[in-house]
């Protein structure tokens, strides 16, 4: 929660407030970590849980011993947040579930589900200069919303996968709730291995992932003729800079049409005829419809993608150079996906 903002010590103060609010919870969880062998706690302030899964917790392939035999099996994940699906960018099948289901899974109970339809999403080409993973994912959201993928799995394949970084794949997988699918899965390939090395996984784990995936037919192979329930395709060269809104992520708006679309939405939604009086730092301000009151770079989708974060930093740098200033009533916040990002 952002209580303090626009000051050099805002981060440390907000972290301290979190400890003050949740000290009892943190103490209980710390006890749990020492009491149970299969229970780990990631310290507060480390990052957004989905990014921590990518960087630290997920193994892609696990191994364990039972009855004197060593078994290897695919990594899976269920979480209580809808954007748990982000881990599918790392070839780990996972999605969000309800609290009771998650608790049952923690206690060793299975989660039941119907075998889903699988929609193949073919990706070809390469993103043009000036377009980002955010532009791509908004395009995919719009396409899959029109297609109708509620309750279905989406698996991405095609020659264009080699042109998508793991961070870009994670961005796409993260938005599965927005395009309506249970998950958006990326198969294991060289980019997966590259990320595991980059994030400091040990050599034995990486070797196991590569060998197991290839032996079990889980390794991405463009020559394989996979049978999907249905397919859809996208040429990355056709993706252009976009935003979405004003309310739904599938309402994609080309950046070139942003001003016109804002004017249209403003006229349709404006209801306040008299400005609202607000007091900030003991000063009175009048705020009217259309004024920005929150400037936040905090979503688990964008703040976990280094290239998008760099883009935000460059825009901020240019804004400072041009002498632009934030209005006193605007609450600003930045929450990177992790300390690594």
Mark where each language-model region is.
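Fe-S-dependent hydro-lyases/dehydratases of central metabolism
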Residues: 1-341
């Amino acid at each position: 929660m952002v209580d303090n903002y626009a000051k050099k010590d805002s981060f440390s103060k907000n972290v301290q407030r979190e400890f003050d609010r949740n000290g009892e919870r943190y103490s209980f969880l710390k006890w749990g970590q020492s009491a149970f062998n299969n229970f780990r706690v990631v310290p507060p302030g480390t990052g957004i849980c989905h990014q921590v899964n990518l960087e630290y917790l997920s193994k892609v392939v696990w191994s364990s011993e039972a009855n004197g035999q060593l078994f290897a099996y695919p990594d899976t994940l269920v979480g209580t947040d809808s954007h748990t699906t982000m881990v599918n960018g790392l070839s780990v099948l996972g999605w969000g579930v309800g609290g009771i289901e998650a608790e049952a899974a923690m206690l060793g109970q299975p989660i039941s589900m119907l075998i889903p339809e699988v929609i193949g999403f073919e990706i070809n080409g390469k993103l043009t200069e000036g377009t980002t993973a955010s532009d791509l994912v908004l395009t995919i959201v719009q396409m899959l919303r029109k297609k109708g993928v509620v309750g279905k799995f989406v698996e991405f394949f095609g020659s264009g996968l080699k042109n998508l970084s793991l961070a870009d794949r994670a961005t796409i997988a993260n938005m599965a709730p927005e395009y309506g699918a249970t998950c958006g899965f990326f198969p294991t390939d060289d980019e997966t291995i590259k990320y595991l090395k980059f994030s400091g996984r040990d050599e034995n784990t990486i070797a196991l992932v590569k060998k197991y995936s290839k032996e079990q037919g889980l390794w991405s192979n463009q020559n394989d003729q996979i049978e999907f329930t249905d397919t859809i395709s996208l040429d990355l060269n056709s993706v252009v800079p976009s935003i979405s809104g004003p309310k739904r992520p599938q309402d994609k708006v080309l950046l070139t049409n942003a001003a016109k679309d804002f004017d249209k939405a403003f006229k349709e939604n404006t209801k306040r005829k008299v400005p609202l009086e607000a007091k900030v730092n003991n000063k009175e301000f009048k705020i009217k419809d259309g004024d920005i009151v929150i400037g936040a770079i905090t979503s688990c989708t964008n703040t976990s993608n280094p290239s998008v974060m760099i883009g935000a930093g460059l825009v901020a740098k240019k804004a400072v150079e041009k002498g632009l200033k934030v209005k006193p009533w605007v609450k600003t916040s930045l929450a990177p996906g992790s300390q690594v990002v």
